[in-house]
Amino acid sequence: MVITETVYNMLLRALHVTYTPDEDTEQRIRAEGAAGKDLLNRYADPDADCEPGTRCGQLLCDYVMRAEAGAAETFLVDFAQDIVETKSEYDARIWAAGKGYTEAEGNAETQGD
């Protein structure tokens, strides 16, 4: 899985990288970002793009910071509540879409009724 330039730049900002990373560092951060995005898509929200300003974007930053510290294996345990909440929101969104609800309509209107 590949991360976008926007997501890569978000990760650099989260890691406080103020220099131009060398090729090895860039590849490592991109690989960690891709692994984190894959994990979040698998366990939290399959549709998440992990863009800046989103819950999954912040979770991805947290994952990459853990990975950079050599502690990526602690992520699922330490952020379990956030992952479950994100998964619940995804499931509710899919359920609502299946019932004909749309986000723009608000909370109690359906299409075609």
Regions found by a protein language model. Name each.
Residues M1-T18, Q111-D113:
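Short, intrinsically disordered N-terminal pre-domain segments
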Residues T20, D24, E51-D113:
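Short loop/turn elements at secondary-structure junctions
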Residues D22-P46, G57-M65:
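Amphipathic alpha-helical segments that form the core helices of the histone-fold
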Residues I3, R28, D47-A48, P52, ...:
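Short, flexible coil/linker segments at or flanking structured domains
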Residues T6-M10, R28, D78:
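Exposed alpha-helical structural elements
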Residues L11-L15, L39-L40, L59-L60, L76:
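Generic detector of leucine side chains in alpha-helical contexts
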